[in-house]
Each structure stands twice: as structure tokens, then as C-alpha cells.
Curated annotation (Swiss-Prot):
One of its GO terms (cellular component) is proton-transporting ATP synthase complex. It is a peripheral membrane protein. One of its GO terms (molecular function) is ATP binding. It comes from Cuscuta exaltata (Tall dodder). F-type ATPases have 2 components, CF(1) - the catalytic core - and CF(0) - the membrane proton channel. CF(1) has five subunits: alpha(3), beta(3), gamma(1), delta(1), epsilon(1). CF(0) has four main subunits: a(1), b(1), b'(1) and c(9-12). This is ATP synthase subunit beta, plastid. SMART domains: AAA. Its EC number is 7.1.2.2.
Length: 490
């Protein structure tokens, strides 16, 4: 069994045999440590700072640079308050190791794999290092299949690939985290799958809200914790940059075990992948590297690739990853979101304009893309319906300037009909969420793909032209829209 640097007890005697060094410099979350000649630790090895006298070991660091003169530079995963030059440092001989397997379900961990939910210790008989190689090329599974989410706009216009990588793009406050919570809820209930959630550099309040929501919805089973469907790994925005940079790898390591050993299909949620890049940028500056474009780290592509290439499907199982991507100043050309784009199979772009109109989920139907939207994968009917919906919405977008200047009455009869149908489609793309019931007062709806296609075909065919557009707002399937229209008339 590998030694977990975050566990103590009987392992102290084993630790006594490890290499030892001393802190020679502390610059915020970065430590320089001197080791005896010939006893240098490897890059990525975990170092543990041992407190003075009878204090327990308290701060875990990760080796980032070998400086020469028997010195290494390491980044701390915890606060460095109270550390002093001359303190003893122990080289653990391996990278940071975290618990994996069924014992992680229903629990909340930090970057070091320590439980932080006050439910006692976790079984550490099965552990794994957070730094691992991506699966070999011959192990990869390349078959294409749709992953149904129950969210109309996603399933119809930018469907997700089972075992693929999906990005949720949006600025601050347009609904990325709510959409992720809804996906976790739908997937746990409809597919019964295991999920791992990596909270990377986001608000502590959101992490707490997510945990409470999961307990209420039964995704986390407090009475029988082993029946829970999700493991949570948090590295919040108040934590040191080292923790925020590595917490994504901790979550991924737990997901890899379910895929490779348990041979399961796993969902990995990362909220927010931009914070992973941001933390890497901070660490890069602290290590003295020359900044690249817009102040980002010169190793941006390498760091992103080392994380993303491990998220894949193998012949044993799959990891489907859904990643929220904060877009700084709503600029999709910023190096952080632009680098993320290269790794994704589908993009779900959230629009501030739609959010301002009150259309939730505020998914932009024209900007969102998916490599799965091909007739040979989704079928002719799905593909044709999606294309017609996009064409109608695109024509409406082109006509908006004319409407703003001249008014709706100046349009041709055909264009007026297109605008009316587009407005119905736009509203029908909205949907009440299970996780937003407390805010909206409307019960959440899960809409199957076949039902979604049927609904949009009815709108496009003109059969529902007589119904008022408000009947299509925040409903599930098309039958609910027709019922709502009847209620509006009475």
C-alpha cells in the first residue's frame, strides 16, 4: 500500500525512514527545501512539513523544480501560516496519493484526499497517485453514442457523446453551476451512474448548496452512505493556488478507478476548468516563469493536455466529462477558453442575452455545437429537425435589426410567420429544472429525446401556429404547452 501523506497513525514509523530536508526559504505558498547530497526528491513527489516538537505533520507540498545545490522548490497544498526556516521536511517518495473506490461515494474530500464532511475517516486500503499517464492508444474505445440528458436544448441541438468531453461556456451569473447541478440530478436518476464532482476554485457557498441539494434529492444517501451516487472533491477559491491547481487531478483519479477497476461508466463534473488554468498561472508566476499571452503560463497547453487526455473512454469503461468554463469578459478568444475548446466534443454556450430575457437554461442554440450532430450518428429525423430549428432561429436573428427599425408590420407574410415560429421555438427551448424548483415554483421536467423531436416538429410544421407564444415558456413536452394554451384562454 502506498503511504498517504495525509494520514498519520501507524504509518509514522514508515515515515521515519524517508529522506529528510529543511526549509531554507518561504515565499507565500512556495517553499525552497534543502536535502542532503544524493537524496533529492523527484518532480511531483509529496513533501510533508513536520511541526516542531510534538506537533503533528501539517503542510503537504508538491515538488515543482530542482534548483541545484541540493535544493528543490515546492508548492504548498495548505496554508503556510506558521512555517519557519529550518523546519524539517519529509520526502514521501511518491506523488500525492488519495483514496479511491466505493468508500469515496457520498463523501467530500480536499485535494489531499482527506474527508472534510465530519463523517469520520475513509478506508485508505485502496489509494492511487494523482499523477498518472493517459491510457495507451490501443486501450481507447472509439464507438459513438448519444448521452441523453433530458434537457431539450442540449439533446436536440448540441447532443453529448457518451465518454466525451463537453464544455459549458458562459460569463459570470448566466447559470453554469445550475445546469451542472441539473445534469448530476438527471443522470443519477435516469441512468443510475456514478459521478465525481470536482469543485475547482469556485465559491464555498456553491459547494455547500450543491451538497445540500444532493442530500435532498437522494443522490447522496445519508442513511446508507455506500448507496450514494457521487463523490465530491472541493478546492475552493479561498485555498492556496497549489490546491486549486491539483484538485481537478484528485477528482479525475477517483473517476479513473471507477472506470478502470470497477469497469463503470462515470461522469466527471469540473466546475470550473478556468480556475484550474488560473491557479496554474498563479503557480507559474510564483515559480518565476516568464508569462505568455495575456499573462497566462507558458505551459498552458501542456497542463490542459495532461488533464484532458486522461479523461477518455477505454475498453473497460468510460468517463464522460462536463466542464464549466468561465469566459473572462465574455471573450471566447481568451487563451484559457480557446485552449479548452481544442479538447471538447461538444460545447454548450450560455448567452447573457437569453438570460436577460428570462429564458432558462440560457443555452445559445446557434453558438452551441456538437460533433455528434451528424445524420449517421443521431439519425435523419433528429438531424433534419435540429437543422430546421437552427435555420428558423438564424433567420429570426437576421430580421431583428429590420424589426427594431421598421417594426414587425413591414415584414413579408412569410417572414412574419418565421418570426412567430422562432419566438415559440425560443420559448419552448426553456425548461423548468428540478434543482431550481425552490426558485421558480415550477416542478422540474425530464424530457426524452423522442418527445423533444416530436415537439419541435409540431412547431415547425405550423400545426401550433394558433397557440400564444407564452404557452411554450417553461414547459416540459409539447402536450404541456397545448394544455397551458387552453388554460390561458379560459
Amino acid at each position: 500500500m502506498r503511504i498517504n501523506p495525509t494520514t498519520y497513525g501507524s504509518e509514522i514509523s514508515l515515515i521515519e525512514k524517508k529522506n529528510r530536508g529543511r526549509i531554507v526559504q518561504i515565499i507565500g505558498p512556495v517553499l525552497d527545501v534543502a536535502f542532503p547530497p544524493g537524496k533529492m526528491p523527484n518532480i511531483y513527489n509529496a513533501l510533508v512539513v513536520k511541526g516542531r516538537d510534538t506537533e503533528q505533520m501539517n503542510v503537504t507540498c508538491e515538488v515543482q523544480q530542482l534548483l541545484g545545490n541540493n535544493r528543490v522548490r515546492a508548492v504548498a497544498m495548505n496554508d503556510t501560516d506558521g512555517l519557519m526556516r529550518g523546519m524539517e521536511v519529509i520526502d514521501m517518495g511518491t506523488p500525492i496519493t488519495v483514496p479511491v473506490g466505493g468508500s469515496t461515494l457520498g463523501r467530500i474530500f480536499n485535494v489531499l484526499g482527506e474527508p472534510v464532511d465530519n463523517f469520520g475517516p475513509v478506508d485508505t486500503n485502496t489509494t492511487s497517485t494523482i499523477h498518472r499517464s493517459a491510457p495507451a492508444f490501443i486501450q481507447l474505445d472509439t464507438k459513438l453514442s448519444i448521452f441523453e440528458t433530458g434537457i431539450k436544448v442540449v439533446d436536440l441541438l448540441a447532443p453529448y457523446r457518451r465518454g466525451g468531453k463537453i464544455g459549458l461556456f458562459g460569463g459570470a451569473g448566466v447559470g453554469k453551476t445550475v445546469l451542472i447541478m441539473e445534469l448530476i440530478n438527471n443522470i443519477a436518476k435516469a441512468h443510475g451512474g456514478v459521478s465525481v464532482f470536482g469543485g475547482v476554485g469556485e465559491r464555498t457557498r456553491e459547494g455547500n448548496d450543491l451538497y445540500m441539494e444532493m442530500k435532498e434529492s437522494g443522490v447522496i444517501n445519508e442513511k446508507n452512505i455506500t448507496e450514494s451516487k457521487v463523490a465530491l472533491v472541493y478546492g475552493q477559491m479561498n485555498e492556496p493556488p497549489g490546491a486549486r491547481m491539483r484538485v481537478g487531478l484528485t477528482a479525475l483519479t477517483m473517476a479513473e478507478y471507477f472506470r478502470d477497476v470497477n469497469e463503470q461508466d462515470v461522469l466527471l463534473f469540473i466546475d470550473n476548468i478556468f480556475r484550474f488554468v488560473q491557479a496554474g498561472s498563479e503557480v507559474s508566476a510564483l515559480l518565476g516563469r516568464m508569462p505568455s499571452a495575456v499573462g497566462y503560463q507558458p505551459t498552458l497547453s501542456t497542463e490542459m493536455g495532461s488533464l484532458q487526455e486522461r479523461i477518455t473512454s477505454t475498453k473497460e469503461g468510460s468517463i464522460t466529462s462536463i466542464q464549466a468554463v468561465y469566459v473572462p469578459a465574455d471573450d471566447l478568444t481568451d487563451p484559457a477558453p480557446a485552449t479548452t475548446f481544442a479538447h471538447l466534443d461538444a460545447t454548450t454556450v450560455l448567452s447573457r442575452g437569453l438570460a436577460a430575457k428570462g429564458i432558462y437554461p440560457a443555452v445559445d442554440p446557434l453558438d452551441s455545437t456538437s460533433m455528434m450532430l451528424q445524420p449517421r450518428i443521431v439519425g435523419e429525423e433528429h438531424y433534419e429537425t435540429a437543422q430546421k430549428v437552427k435555420q428558423t432561429l438564424q433567420r429570426y436573428k437576421e430580421l431583428q435589426d429590420i424589426i427594431a427599425i421598421l417594426g414587425l408590420d413591414e415584414l413579408s407574410e412569410e417572414d412574419r410567420l418565421t418570426v412567430a415560429r422562432a419566438r415559440k421555438i425560443e420559448r419552448f427551448l426553456s425548461q423548468p429544472f428540478f434543482v431550481a424548483e425552490v426558485f421558480t415554483g415550477s416542478p422540474g421536467k425530464y424530457v426524452g429525446l423522442a418527445e423533444t423531436i416530436r415537439g419541435f416538429n409540431l412547431i415547425l410544421s405550423g400545426e401550433l401556429d394558433s397557440l400564444p407564444e407564452q404557452a411554450f415558456y417553461l414547459v416540459g413536452n409539447i402536450d404541456e404547452a397545448t394544455k397551458k394554451a387552453m388554460d390561458l384562454k379560459t
